């Protein structure tokens, strides 16, 4: 199996992306196609011993930067690492794509060249969030669709359900709507209409609404919302987590006794940090496009890239997109 990696995507590319690819080929049976500036990639590879038969390079002269407008950049920079990686998937030269680059550009490129799974109205950007249980939850959408219809959210629920069943082996995952209250009548018109739709769908183990405070409790395995709400929720959570760790670090250094206490608690802090670390999950899928595309955090280092490549491998092996289509057909058969 071959996975294309956008070697130029992310804050620490190409050094960390290349290192992540090398770690991945050691731990799995995949081959990695590094897409990016060939000379830069070769220079990094010179410092490592690796199985050369499992690494290929496809040169891409251009890079879509994080600040660039996604749709314009994809059309203007056809020789960019993101676009060329997606084109390799379209041409069936690879089985999946991983990128830590401009999320919007990855999505725009995937829609332009791969299209949607038949019947999917809108793809969704998802992310995995740590919980108090041993299994993360998936939240979608987190930015692809600011304005949604109830049918879009129903499909997001389906895609999240299939992903949790196949990738994390969660049987009959609990599905919830992110809302301003737990009661059925809460929320705007979209949320209330979607509530009724999910409640009456026999395919779903729908548990109702969850509030923002419940996101990390593991109350639901799949959390559904529109892209505006999802993006605000995730960015807020990231900011709170970073601020808390900064405050703790500052307090620990404030006196000798707190330094000693901090040293004693260091292993516990490490465990907590590991549970909150996005690199453990690697990346999250762009669900609904007709191909396996994994989007990693822009700050991904080698470990996150390695794990993202493994997620892509698993998605391909388990035929997640095929199962999404099968689930979609069941919804359609109900006459919705």
Swiss-Prot record:
Gene Ontology CC: one annotated term: cytoplasm
A GO molecular-function descriptor: phosphate:acyl-[acyl carrier protein] acyltransferase activity
Reaction(s) the record says it catalyses: a fatty acyl-[ACP] + phosphate = an acyl phosphate + holo-[ACP]
One GO BP annotation of this record: fatty acid biosynthetic process
Tagged with keyword Flavoprotein: no
Subcellular location, record wording: Cytoplasm
Pathway annotation from the record: Lipid metabolism; phospholipid metabolism
Name of the top EC class for this enzyme: transferase
Sequence similarity: Belongs to the PlsX family.
Record note on quaternary structure: Homodimer. Probably interacts with PlsY.
Listed name of the protein: Phosphate acyltransferase
């Amino acid at each position: 199996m071959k996975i294309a990696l956008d070697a130029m995507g992310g804050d620490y590319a190409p050094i960390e992306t290349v290192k992540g690819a090398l770690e991945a080929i050691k731990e799995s049976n995949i081959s990695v196609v590094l897409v990016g500036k060939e000379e830069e990639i070769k220079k990094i590879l010179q410092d490592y011993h690796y199985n050369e038969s499992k690494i290929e390079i496809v040169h891409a002269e251009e890079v879509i930067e994080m600040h660039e407008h996604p749709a314009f950049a994809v059309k203007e920079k056809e020789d960019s690492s993101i676009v060329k990686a997606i084109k390799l998937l379209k041409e069936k030269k690879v089985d999946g794509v991983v990128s830590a680059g401009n999320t919007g550009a990855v999505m725009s490129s995937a829609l332009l060249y791969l299209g949607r799974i038949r019947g999917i109205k809108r793809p969704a950007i998802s992310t995995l969030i740590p919980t108090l249980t041993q299994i993360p939850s998936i939240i979608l959408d987190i930015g692809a669709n600011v304005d949604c219809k109830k049918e879009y959210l129903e499909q997001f629920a389906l895609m999240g359900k299939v992903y949790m069943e196949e990738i994390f082996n969660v049987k009959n995952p609990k599905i919830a709507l992110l809302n301003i209250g737990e009661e059925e009548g809460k929320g705007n018109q979209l949320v209330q209409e979607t509530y009724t739709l999910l409640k009456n769908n026999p395919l779903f183990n729908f548990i109702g609404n969850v509030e923002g405070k419940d996101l990390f409790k593991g109350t639901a395995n799949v959390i559904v919302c529109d892209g505006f709400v999802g993006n605000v929720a995730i960015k807020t959570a990231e900011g709170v987590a970073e601020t808390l760790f900064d405050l703790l670090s500052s307090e620990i250094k404030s006196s000798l006794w707190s330094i000693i206490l901090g040293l004693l608690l260091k292993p516990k802090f490490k465990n907590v940090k590991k549970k909150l670390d996005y690199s453990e999950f690697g990346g999250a899928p762009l669900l609904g496009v007709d191909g396996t595309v994994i989007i990693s955090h822009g700050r991904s280092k080698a470990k996150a890239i390695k794990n993202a490549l493994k997620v892509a491998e698993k998605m391909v092996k388990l035929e997640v997109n095929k199962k999404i289509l099968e689930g979609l057909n069941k919804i359609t058969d109900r006459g919705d």
